[in-house]
Amino acid sequence: MEKNDVINFKALEKELQAALAADEKYKRENAAKLRAVEQRVPSYEEFRGIVLASHLKPLEQKDKMGGKRFVPWNCHTTRERTSQDVVTEIPQEKSPFQPTTSAEFYRDWRRHLRSGPERYQALLQLGGPKLGHLFQMDVGFGLLGELLVALAEHARLSDRTAVLGILHSLANTGRFNLNLSLLSHAERESCQRLFQKLQAMSTTRPMQEGLTVEEPSAGLQGEEGLLQELLELYGVH
């Protein structure tokens, strides 16, 4: 086996542990969200606080007693790494964004897709039908706002049909109205800005296709009907 072909099992184990932790975080936050809804919390701030604190556990009796704790010093943990400890790492290419569950989407969206353009292209790559299938039960806490921000910042005229399809699929996901009501002020502004962009494209696109605004094609008429429906679903006026 060539030196560059040595597999870094420690890195693979670390990646697996991170994936399991992300899945657990997704389930924990959704459970906290349901509890907050059942408790009828009076404000978004309190709702958000409950979800963000979902990882905290009540203190056990032994933790409340106080007192100093002494940890034995382990000389073996401070030794220098030898040549046997060093494993040649294989350069890992960025894998395509192909989540098969909402938990995988949530994990990879937060871990690998950091920039706005990357997130926008990932949404276009998946498309409305795939997103609708992934989130048929519910969009994770805070995720709807992030999706709308990515679309608002990078939507282009050539992608208008695809963006409308994505918005339509998201509007048909579980608990959509609840997630919509929990958008932050900045996310609501992004949503408003996105629909303003889409409306502005209504006059730009016919001109590029050699049509008049008064006589759009049948396809454009269908898109305009969908846009009006989405304006109502997203509460944009």
From Swiss-Prot:
One of its GO terms (biological process) is determination of digestive tract left/right asymmetry. It is found in: Cytoplasm; Cell projection, Cilium, Flagellum. InterPro entries: CC103, Dynein_attach_N, RPAP3-like_C. Keywords: Cell projection, Cilium, Cilium biogenesis/degradation, Coiled coil, Cytoplasm, Flagellum. Residues 8-33 form a coiled coil. GO terms for cellular component: motile cilium; outer dynein arm. GO terms for molecular function: protein homodimerization activity. Its main location: cytoplasm. The keyword Nucleus does not apply. It comes from the Eukaryota. Dynein-attachment factor required for cilia motility. Homodimer. Belongs to the DNAAF19/PR46b family. This is Dynein axonemal assembly factor 19. It comes from Mus musculus (Mouse). The gene is Dnaaf19.
